[in-house]
Each structure stands twice: as C-alpha cells, then as structure tokens.
C-alpha cells in the first residue's frame, strides 16, 4: 500500500483548488504581508539563533513564559524534533489522524501503535483511554481538533489521557495547529495544563490559521 504524504504537493499536477492542507481561505493577514515587504533588507542577515524577539512575541500572544517556547520551521519539523529528542521506541497515534506523526516515528526507527477512534460515533475518543492503558509506549500523539475528522477531544477524556500518560512517564505531544479556528481557543488549549503536566508538549504553527504555509514557521510550548 502506498503511504500518503503531507498535502500541498500541487506542483506536478494541474490544481486550481487545493483541499489537501486546509489553509485559511481568508488568506495571509495584511500586516504579515506588509511586514515582509517592508523588511526585505533583513533577509540579507542570519536570524537570531535563539529567536528571542519571536519567542517573546509568541509568549505575549499565548500568555505563557517565553522560556517555555521553542520555534522551528513549521509543525512538521517540530514533531520530528520531539521524537528525535525523546527517542521513544513505541508511540501511540490515533487512527485516523495526521500521517506526519507516523512518518516522524518511523524516521527515527521507532514503532507506531494505533488507538482507534470510534467510527460509529463520529470518530470519537470514548475508547481512547482504555486502549492507551494497555499500550507499552513512551510517547502519545493527540491532535485537537483531530485532522482529518475535525472533532475536538472532550475535556474529561483529554484530562484522562494526560493523567494516564503522566502516571506512566509517557510524553504527550498535543498538536493544536487547527485549534485557533475555534473562538474558544484560549479556554480549550492544552497550554492551561502546562503547570500540571511536565510531560506535555504542545505544537502549533502559523501555517493554517494565518495562511503562512510558505514561510515555514511553527512553535512548541512545554513546561521544561
């Protein structure tokens, strides 16, 4: 069976409308376009290797400490970086979900074990916790809202997953790249759990909500 790759590969096909990556149809904000055009001379120099100003700006937007933020070239690179840093030998991934998790896991020689979402109930997470309890894993990926199903993880199940993984020293990687489309982002984001779960890593990006796919900019948040 042919493995699917990340969407957006429109260059060897005649594509007029690309539905593979779900980017904001409103397009890139005018302020971003203006900032790029008005700072062209800045591209002649290397960026700050610590991304100090960027991390502080993200910290202000997310209302978290700057030292809890790490920036990278999009969410996909950061997913790879987490797996590379933690070196798990088996990771849990929802099915169905974003294929990039399995790709990152495989790239570093680890194994993927799937916890299956309930297709009969809109691909819900009702059985996720019981499945995770029986898995011998070191890392668990959750996508909230899930891609491609679009459903949010209910609050009680989300907390249960975090508790299960914390008690078993399992790193939780929470992908929230689509969550900012939800008006309640500030209330439902996992960042509110950073003080309570030192095993939690949250990944976000400017790609989807801000329609900045070509700029390749993402960030992760973690307690440590």
Where do the language-model regions lie?
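Short glycine-rich anion-binding loops that position phosphate/pyrophosphate groups of nucleotides
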Residues: 22-24, 75-76, 98, 144-148, ...
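N-terminal "arm"/small-domain region of PLP-dependent enzymes with the aminotransferase-like
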Residues: 1-45, 170
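Hydrophobic/aromatic residues located in beta-strands of well-ordered beta-sheets
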Residues: 69, 91, 112, 172, ...
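Active-site pre-lysine segment of PLP-dependent enzymes
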Residues: 123-136, 148-168, 172, 176-210
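Conserved core segment of the aminotransferase class I/II
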Residues: 50, 63, 114, 195-224
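Phosphate-binding glycine-rich loop
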Residues: 51-91
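PLP-dependent aminotransferase-like
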Residues: 85-142
